């Protein structure tokens, strides 16, 4: 099972999550999307695909903040967890993709195994982030 965990303010990360979920299902993977992620509802094993934008001064969107805080405050045993992170941002800000980069580092710090490097999508270059995310998934799908 691939748990797709989104952090979104305006819906862009949710759209990317929906699109990647469809593509993964077409390849035979089981997926579950968590647009309001809750640590108690997502097992710390299998695969997590975190897709998040960055809000304000490098912060997480409101919907994913409690999930990230739970990971930081009471990290679960992640020895059986693999993860990938897609970070969506705007390179005209100095906090470009800060939330996604932090999530990637946090998961590694608490013992989860990365499937790929943190993938950043610059909306200045990719106004439709689903397209960039799809190209990335095609490159790394064999790692899932």
Swiss-Prot record:
Its cofactor is FMN. Pfam families: Flavodoxin_1. The keyword Zinc does not apply. One of its GO terms (molecular function) is FMN binding. PROSITE patterns: FLAVODOXIN_LIKE (PS50902). InterPro entries: Flavodoxin/NO_synth, Flavoprotein-like_sf. Keywords: Electron transport, Flavoprotein, FMN, Transport. The keyword Acetylation does not apply. Belongs to the flavodoxin family. MioC subfamily. Probable electron transporter required for biotin synthase activity. This is Protein MioC homolog. It comes from Vibrio cholerae serotype O1 (strain ATCC 39315 / El Tor Inaba N16961). The gene is mioC.
């Amino acid at each position: 099972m691939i748990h797709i965990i989104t952090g979104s303010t305006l819906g862009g990360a949710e759209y990317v999550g929906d699109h990647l979920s469809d593509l993964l299902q077409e390849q035979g993977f089981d997926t579950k999307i968590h647009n309001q992620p809750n640590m108690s509802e997502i097992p710390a094993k299998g695969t997590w695909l975190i897709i998040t934008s960055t809000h304000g001064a490098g912060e997480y969107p409101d919907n994913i903040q409690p999930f990230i805080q739970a990971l930081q405050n009471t990290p679960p045993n992640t020895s059986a967890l693999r993860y990938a992170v897609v970070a969506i941002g705007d390179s005209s800000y100095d906090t470009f993709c800060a939330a996604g980069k932090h999530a990637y580092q946090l998961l590694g710090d608490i013992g989860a195994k990365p499937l790929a490097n943190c993938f950043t999508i610059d909306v200045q270059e990719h106004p439709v982030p689903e397209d960039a995310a799809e190209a990335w998934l095609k490159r790394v799908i064999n790692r899932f």
